[in-house]
């Protein structure tokens, strides 16, 4: 057995590892600073300012969002994009990794880009991603293209972090402008007349490319139907090795839309004379996945690309972009970049420190109430009859118990802050279940494990356990991949019949790793 390593005598255990953190710029960029004389954004100035966590005047942010939206509004549902092009997957508010993406993929000034959606939510720099990408869209309207993801909607941004982020960093007006802009995003792209590019995937109601062109996209995505499927659907977990003959089955992971099968993809490709489908929507350990090849073309029938490295700071995954040029497909991977730290849910330091302060205050209150012994209380109450004296004693004891319970709550909050954050992240509302804190440390840990197991996540998880693998992180985060409950979630009778039929044939397969090839010709 090896001996434990001794502490490096040169490593200080009293000094801060990070001695100082630069304060974000207090100055907000004005329109004169952001836009040149021709009304085009100065993206280099914008990038430098946002990298320092700087902000813009609200009128400037609104101008970028609305001008970008007006360009998006003029584009078709299905874009036609020529090669060469660099295709990017989910970003999810990871602005500093987005900057790394442009280093790997090439400058937008001389590189054609196609983004497959999910620019916001989960990460804490979503508004920076929107402002920068929309500024690039204004500057390069014919070479930078943005598709809609399932998170570009009111329902998910209210449920997750984007709305709260907009209100903290700017205002609800900026959030509303973003929602209007998201309604303008195209739904799909036809790349080089060979590849259909979407965020999620296929729909049983979309058989031809014209079916996409006919959709009304200028609205909040519905809870079912072809527009929902384009944004939400996934390939079957055992894609290419299906145990079902159905082309589409109910998507039990998302709680909406469908899983589509290898035969469904091959039939769609053959019917529309296409080579492959490029999509995002699912985190990948390597940043990408290539699925089973088409028997007619020998090319992967489906490719998933994911461009948010170390997703949520826990997945430990690589990110990737796909460069297609001269009929050669090249995958470029990259790792995460350092980024400023935000407390969970944009919490401020005063809220964060409240448990520490509260614990000390309640300790003092308990000590004040306990200043008299039972004998002293009894001697002071000789003037009262027995019933009154007993009642007074019980009132005081109840006060002490109440303060003691409050002290235990603050103590649990202080000692188990990581467990509290874990449990908050695993509950759909982001709130702790009632009575968890007052039950003490054991109740908190039990509730955390129950919350995880309720969503079929990894069993035996402990809040103190450090997540070490991609699959473990993906399992724990599974609850957040579902569509949150909404009022219009009930489909029409016709759609209900098809869903019931799909449910009857549902399977639970085990995924196999796709090809790890980085070049395809």
Curated annotation (Swiss-Prot):
Coiled-coil spans in chain: none
Bias type Low complexity, positions: 507-521
Binding site for Zn(2+): 118, 150, 199, 281
Signal sequence region: none
Residue interval(s) of motif SAPNY motif: 307-311
Record-listed 3'-nitrotyrosine modification sites: 224
Catalytic site positions: 151 (proton donor)
A GO MF term: protein dimerization activity
Region entry Catalytic, spans: 56-340
Membrane-protein topology: Peripheral membrane protein
Location in or out of the cell: Cytoplasm; Cell membrane; Cell membrane, Sarcolemma; Cytoplasm, Myofibril, Sarcomere, Z line
Keywords (A to Z) from UniProt: Acetylation, Calmodulin-binding, Cell membrane, Cell projection, Cytoplasm, Hydrolase, Iron, Membrane, Metal-binding, Nitration, Phosphoprotein, Protein phosphatase, Synapse, Zinc
Modified residues (Phosphoserine): 469, 492
Region (Autoinhibitory segment): 407-414
Region (Calcineurin B binding): 341-369
EC number assigned by the record: 3.1.3.16
A cellular component annotation (GO) from this entry: cytosol
Cofactor note: Binds 1 Fe(3+) ion per subunit.
Composition-biased stretches (Basic and acidic residues): 475-490
Keyword Cytoplasm: yes
Tissue: Expressed in neonatal cardiomyocytes (at protein level). Expressed in hippocampal presynaptic termini (at protein level).
Modified residue annotations for N-acetylserine: 2
Record text on subunit structure and interactions: Forms a complex composed of a calmodulin-dependent catalytic subunit (also known as calcineurin A) and a regulatory Ca(2+)-binding subunit (also known as calcineurin B). There are three catalytic subunits, each encoded by a separate gene (PPP3CA, PPP3CB, and PPP3CC) and two regulatory subunits which are also encoded by separate genes (PPP3R1 and PPP3R2). In response to an increase in Ca(2+) intracellular levels, forms a complex composed of PPP3CA/calcineurin A, calcineurin B and calmodulin. Interacts (via calcineurin B binding domain) with regulatory subunit PPP3R1/calcineurin B.
Family: Belongs to the PPP phosphatase family. PP-2B subfamily.
Domain notes from UniProt: The autoinhibitory domain prevents access to the catalytic site.
UniProt-recorded name of the protein: Protein phosphatase 3 catalytic subunit alpha
């Amino acid at each position: 057995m090896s001996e434990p390593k001794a502490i490096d005598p040169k490593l200080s255990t009293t000094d801060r590892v990070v001695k100082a953190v630069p304060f974000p710029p207090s100055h907000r960029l004005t329109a004169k600073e952001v836009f040149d004389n021709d009304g085009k954004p100065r993206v280099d100035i914008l990038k430098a300012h946002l990298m320092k966590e700087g902000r813009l005047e609200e009128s400037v942010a609104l101008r970028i969002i609305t001008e970008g939206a007006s360009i998006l509004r003029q584009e078709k549902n299905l874009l036609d994009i020529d090669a060469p092009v660099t295709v990017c997957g989910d970003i999810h508010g990871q602005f500093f990794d987005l900057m790394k993406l442009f280093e790997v993929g090439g400058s937008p000034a001389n590189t054609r880009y196609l983004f497959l959606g999910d620019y916001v939510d989960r990460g804490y720099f979503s508004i920076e991603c929107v402002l920068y990408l929309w500024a690039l869209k204004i500057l390069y309207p014919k070479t930078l293209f943005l598709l809609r993801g399932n998170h570009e909607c009111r329902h998910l941004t209210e449920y997750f972090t984007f709305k709260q982020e907009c209100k903290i960093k700017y205002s609800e007006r900026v959030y509303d402008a973003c929602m209007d802009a998201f309604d303008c995003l195209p739904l799909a792209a036809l790349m080089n007349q060979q590849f259909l590019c979407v965020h999620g995937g296929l729909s049983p109601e979309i058989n031809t490319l014209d079916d996409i062109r006919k959709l009304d996209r200028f609205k909040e995505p519905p809870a079912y139907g072809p527009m929902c499927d384009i944004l939400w659907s996934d390939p079957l977990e055992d894609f290419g090795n299906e145990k079902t003959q159905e082309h589409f089955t109910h998507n039990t992971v998302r709680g909406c839309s469908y899983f589509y099968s290898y035969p469904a993809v091959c039939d769609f490709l053959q019917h529309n004379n296409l080579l492959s489908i490029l999509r995002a929507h699912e985190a990948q350990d390597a940043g990408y996945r290539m699925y089973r090849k088409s028997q007619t073309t020998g090319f992967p029938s489906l490719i998933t690309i994911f461009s948010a490295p170390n997703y949520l700071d826990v997945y430990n995954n690589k990110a990737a972009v796909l460069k297609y040029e001269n009929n050669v497909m090249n995958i470029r991977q990259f790792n995460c970049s350092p980024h400023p730290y935000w407390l969970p849910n944009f919490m401020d330091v005063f809220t964060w420190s409240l448990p520490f302060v509260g614990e000390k205050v309640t300790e003092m209150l308990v000590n004040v109430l306990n200043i008299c012994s039972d004998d002293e209380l009894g001697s002071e109450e000789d003037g009262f009859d027995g019933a009154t004296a007993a009642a007074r004693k019980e009132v005081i004891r109840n006060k002490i118990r109440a303060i003691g319970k409050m002290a235990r709550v603050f103590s649990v909050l202080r000692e188990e802050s990581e467990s509290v954050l874990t449990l908050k992240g695993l509950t759909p509302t982001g709130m702790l279940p009632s009575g968890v804190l007052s039950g003490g440390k054991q109740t908190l840990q039990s509730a955390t494990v129950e919350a995880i197991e309720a969503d079929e996540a990894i069993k035996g998880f402990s809040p103190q356990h450090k997540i070490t693998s991609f699959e473990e992180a993906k399992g724990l985060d599974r609850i957040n991949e579902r569509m949150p409950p909404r009022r219009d979630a009930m489909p029409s009778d016709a759609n209900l019949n098809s869903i019931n039929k799909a449910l009857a044939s549902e399977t639970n397969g085990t995924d196999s790793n796709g090809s790890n090839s980085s070049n395809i010709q």
